[in-house]
Structure formats: structure tokens, C-alpha cells
Design a protein with these regions (language model features):
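Nucleotide-activated donor-dependent transferases that construct or modify glycoconjugates
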Residues: 2-15, 42, 194-195
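An aromatic- and histidine-rich active-site surface loop
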Residues: 11, 20, 84-107, 113, ...
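Conserved catalytic-core segment of nucleotide-activated headgroup transferases in glycan assembly
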Residues: 14-29, 38-39, 175-181, 185-254
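A short, charged, and often flexible helix/loop element on the N-terminal side
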Residues: 42-73, 87-88, 93
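Acceptor-binding helix/loop patch of EC 2.4 sugar-transfer enzymes
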Residues: 43-58, 110-140, 168, 175, ...
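Membrane-proximal helix-turn-helix segments that form the acceptor-binding/catalytic region
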Residues: 68-80, 94-107, 112-113, 118-120, ...
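Nucleotide-sugar-dependent
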Residues: 91, 203, 245-281
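Carbohydrate-associated surface elements
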Residues: 155, 173
Length: 283
């Protein structure tokens, strides 16, 4: 009889890079080896698309309420799970109620996985009013109650060791055999400087925009952004491609020079360099 793994995750399947490359790309392998997989996201696709946009407060409240209701129902389904894997947090708002119930009430063991310094406040201006509801401190308890922790890099692992002695570093990986294996044409006379990421991380480009604008006065190039939402700024060199899973590699191959701007701060210490891995994986 096959064993069932419950993946309790924040985002819809196939939407968030952290999920896609930390475990979703391995699900087929697990299924081929006899495991049954169930993905249980906190946000459904509708709420995910609405949450990080301006306005739509009513839709956001309804969507989040529905998310908590689904999490409540999930507690009654956990008896079917042989293994429980929690990525980042069971719910994106509020204290670690669900993790506490799973560990202390239901007495279930779980693996806790994270790939960012998510104990630190980090939020978009769009949802600044809701940031107090995030309860960033809950990450410490999620770590403390976990049976095992998997962290994306040494900085994150060292932090986790304060709360749990069973920590394993598992870097975010790139599949260069089946996925990131396209050869790029670098013979073009007009180079393309490129960035890829979700709209929630686009604020990292704020300090780059003046530099790009200055370069436009001296060189001919395209500045390509690949994201699920277009940027709010304008540039003469700007090109935008809406991210899709189907064309992701083809679009990345258009980039001559990939950039991954970061600030020198504690939050950036927790980054796992995934954009850099994506750029360098393509020949």
C-alpha cells in the first residue's frame, strides 16, 4: 500500500518559484517510487492573483476567510497522511495555530522547509496595512515543533539550529537535464539585460532603474522583465514578457546578461540565489 505525503504550502501549485524548485519538480519522481501526493495550498488561484494587487479589499477578505476555512477542514484529513511537509507556513496570516494543532494536539510529526529569512518583516507596499497580521515570530515555533527542518542555505540553517537540532541544508536546485537545458544565441548585436521574478520581488529593481536609464544614454540594448505582472516604471529600453510555465525557458534564453539585484541586509543573507542559478544554467 502506497504512503501519502501531504504538502501544506502557501501558494497554488505551479505558481511560486520557491515551491516549484524546492519540491514540486520532484513530485513525479516520488509518485514513480510509490508515493501518493496531495498538495494543499493556503491560497487558491483567485486569491493569489488578487492578494498582491492594489484595492480589492473585499475580495481579499473573502479569499483569506475561505483559505482559513479550507485549512480548518484539512485538519480532519490529516489522518490520511503518512508524512506531512510544511513549506514556509500553513497560513500566511496569524499565529501558528495550525502548526500547533498538528504538532501538539494531533501529535503528528512534520518536516518544515524554508528558503528565505521569513522571520523578518518583508512585505509589499500594496499590503502594508495587513503586515501586522503576518506574525513573523511564528516561524521560530514552526521550527521548534518540527521533526526535521530543511533549509535553503547555511545562513538559514544556522538560524534554525537555535530552535531545532535536526536541520539539513537542501539548496534550491535546477533541473538541467529536463528543464534548464536550452542553448542561447549570444551572437546578437543588441544585448538584452534581463530580470525574472514575481511581482512581489520587483521592488529590488527600484535602485537599478536609474542605472538602466543612464545606460540608455550610452548604449543600445533591451531591458527585459519576465514576471507575472508588468512593472510600474517606464524605460525606453523596457520589454515585458508575461511569465508562463510553458515558455519560461524560451523566454530566459533571450537574456544576454541576467541580473539579480539585492540589498546588503539580513534579509538578503537568506536568499538562495535562485535567479543566478537560472541564468547560469542556460548555455
Amino acid at each position: 500500500m502506497s504512503e501519502t505525503i501531504f504538502f501544506i504550502v502557501p501558494y497554488p501549485f505551479g505558481e511560486a518559484p520557491s515551491q516549484r524548485f524546492r519540491f514540486e519538480q520532484y513530485l513525479t519522481f516520488l509518485e514513480e517510487n510509490g508515493f501518493k501526493i496531495e498538495i494543499h495550498p493556503f491560497l487558491n488561484e483567485s486569491t493569489w492573483k488578487t492578494l498582491y494587487r492594489e484595492g480589492n479589499v473585499g475580495k481579499k477578505i473573502i479569499g483569506i476567510t475561505g483559505s482559513f476555512y479550507r485549512r480548518f477542514l484539512l485538519l480532519f484529513q490529516l489522518r490520511r497522511a503518512n508524512h506531512i511537509f510544511i513549506h514556509r507556513e500553513a497560513a500566511q496570516l496569524g499565529p501558528p495555530i495550525f502548526e500547533w494543532i498538528i504538532a501538539k494536539v494531533l501529535r503528528r510529526k512534520y518536516i518544515y522547509d524554508f528558503d528565505d529569512a521569513i522571520w523578518l518583516p518583508n512585505y509589499s507596499e500594496t499590503n502594508a496595512r495587513f503586515q501586522r497580521l503576518k506574525s513573523y515570530w511564528k516561524v521560530n515555533y514552526c521550527m521548534k515543533w518540527a521533526e526535521k527542518i530543511t533549509a535553503g542555505n547555511a545562513y538559514l540553517a544556522n538560524y534554525a539550529l537555535q530552535y531545532n537540532p535536526t536541520v539539513q541544508i537542501i539548496p534550491t536546485t535546477i533541473d538541467t537535464i529536463h528543464h534548464h537545458n536550452r542553448k542561447c544565441d549570444q551572437s546578437t548585436k543588441k544585448p538584452t539585460i534581463g530580470w525574472t521574478g514575481t511581482h512581489t520581488t520587483m521592488h529590488y529593481l527600484d535602485e537599478i532603474v536609474p542605472i538602466i536609464r543612464d545606460l540608455e544614454n550610452h548604449f543600445s540594448f533591451d531591458f527585459l522583465i519576465i514576471s507575472n505582472e508588468p512593472p510600474s516604471f517606464e524605460l525606453a529600453s523596457l520589454k515585458f514578457i508575461k511569465w508562463t510555465k510553458e515558455t519560461e525557458i524560451e523566454d530566459l534564453a533571450k537574456i544576454t546578461i541576467g541580473i539579480m539585484p539585492l540589498k546588503q541586509d539580513i534579509w538578503s543573507e537568506g536568499k538562495c540565489g535562485f535567479k543566478g542559478l537560472q541564468y547560469m544554467a542556460l548555455e
